[in-house]
Each structure stands twice: as structure tokens, then as C-alpha cells.
């Protein structure tokens, strides 16, 4: 996980970010991406939100995390986790050492021109690349709270339009240079009830939100009764290691 923002927010990040739906890990397990005796490299493991599930399902996990405070939290993720304090771009990885490489809400920080060939080398023939993330918001579901969020964002000097970075990297970007072959993309829509305080804590973990904006989101949730239902998405891209780059 890149950026000093997350390092400063390590404990808050661990407490505030909602978990990934079970169906994400069930899908990975069913495909043979994770599970007993499967050696997995996790990119940008952060506080271990996904790492704990990988370990719980029997995977042998090596976790990359450059932030010291976040890495310290990773040591509590369970037996079998080796933590490497490094970005993917800087990591020293042996060739053909992993069955799978995974990234949970982390791949958008990676320089793909460096990262994808490095992942390709680190994977065994036929190995998996699984990239997923939670998208905070669902454009198909408009709520009073989400309208307030849009109003907060619209006040920025350079207002953001669409979801942009939330959706990246796309399957096309991951497969563009021929290092990996697309298998499928899966998307799950889900909802979670959050108190105003939880909204404030969550939004303060977003690197593109200021403290004042997060406070405004918390106040909006408070104005709307003190609890809101947030509609989110989880998007998973599954790819296989190509025999050779094109």
C-alpha cells in the first residue's frame, strides 16, 4: 500500500474499512487461486484486511507492505504470513516462486509497466493474478446521503467526475501488454449500515478526502438520522500468467 496517508492512518484504516464480502474469497478458493498449500504473494497488504482471509483458507502468504505501522499490524494476521517491507516495484522476488499473486484495493498504486512483468516472473507457469477492490458507492443506487456526498465533492476546486481511479486498473489495462490472459471479471453489489461516526472514520481513510470533507460527510449522516445504508461494489479481475509476453 503506497502513500504516507495510509501509514499515518494505520490503526484507523484497520478499524474503519469494511471487510470484503465472503463471496470474493469463496470465488478465489473455488478457482484454486487460494487455499491449502497454495503459495500466494499479496501486493500492498495494508493492515491485513484480505490477508487474514487468505491465511484462514490455508494459503501460504508472503505479504508486501512498505509502511512500518501497517506491516506491524500484518504480523497479527496469523501464522504462515511472511511480511516483506517493500513495494512491489522494489521487491526482490525469486523467479517462479508463487502459485498466485493477489492485490486487494492496492493495484491502482502499482506502476504496471514495472509491476506486471515482475509478477509474471514471480509466478509459476499457469499461475493466477487476482486483482480486486471495494468501490465505495454504487452509481445505480442514489440515496440522500450519496447526494450529500456528491455536493461535498462538487465544492472541490477541481471537481471529480465519475468513479475514475476507483475502477482502476481495468481488465484491459492488466492484460494490455500480454503478460496475462483474462479469465473473467466478477462484480458483486452489497450494502452495509454505518453510523455517522463510522462514516467519519471511514471517509478519513480515503486519501483523496480532506479532514474537513470527512467531517462534512459525518455531519450529513448525522443530519439524516445518525445511520445510513451505503451501497458498495466489489470488483474482481482474474487472469492467468501468459506463456510469454507478446
Question: What kind of feature is each model-predicted range?
Answer:
Residues 39, 47-91:
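Class I SAM-dependent methyltransferase SAM/SAH-binding core
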Residues 1-35:
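Conserved class I S-adenosyl-L-methionine
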Residues 43:
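Conserved beta-strand/loop positions that form the S-adenosyl-L-methionine
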Residues 168-246:
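Conserved Class I S-adenosyl-L-methionine
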Amino acid at each position: 500500500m503506497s502513500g504516507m496517508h495510509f501509514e499515518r492512518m494505520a490503526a484507523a484504516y484497520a478499524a474503519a474499512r469494511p471487510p470484503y464480502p465472503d463471496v470474493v474469497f469463496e470465488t478465489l478458493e473455488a478457482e484454486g487461486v487460494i487455499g491449502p498449500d497454495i503459495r500466494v504473494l499479496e501486493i500492498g497488504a495494508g493492515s491485513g484486511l484480505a490477508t487474514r482471509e487468505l491465511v484462514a483458507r490455508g494459503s501460504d502468504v508472503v505479504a508486501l507492505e512498505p509502511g512500518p505501522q501497517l506491516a506491524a499490524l500484518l504480523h497479527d494476521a496469523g501464522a504462515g504470513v511472511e511480511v516483506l517491507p517493500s513495494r512491489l516495484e522494489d521487491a526482490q522476488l525469486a523467479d517462479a516462486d508463487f502459485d498466485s499473486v493477489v492485490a486487494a484495493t492496492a493495484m491502482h498504486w502499482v506502476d504496471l509497466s514495472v509491476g506486471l512483468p515482475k509478477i509474471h516472473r514471480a509466478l509459476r507457469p499457469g499461475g493466477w493474478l487476482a486483482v480486486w477492490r471495494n468501490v465505495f458507492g454504487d452509481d445505480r443506487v442514489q440515496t440522500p446521503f450519496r447526494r450529500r456526498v456528491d455536493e461535498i465533492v462538487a465544492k472541490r476546486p477541481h471537481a471529480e467526475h465519475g468513479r475514475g481511479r476507483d475502477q482502476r486498473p481495468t481488465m484491459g489495462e492488466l492484460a494490455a501488454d500480454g503478460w496475462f490472459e483474462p479469465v473473467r471479471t466478477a462484480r458483486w453489489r452489497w450494502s452495509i449500515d454505518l453510523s455517522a461516526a463510522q462514516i467519519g472514520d471511514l471517509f478519513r481513510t480515503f486519501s483523496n478526502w480532506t479532514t474537513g470533507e470527512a467531517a462534512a460527510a459525518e455531519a450529513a449522516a448525522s443530519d439524516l438520522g445518525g445511520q445510513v445504508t451505503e451501497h458498495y461494489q466489489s470488483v474482481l479481475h482474474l487472469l492467468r500468467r501468459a506463456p510469454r509476453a507478446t
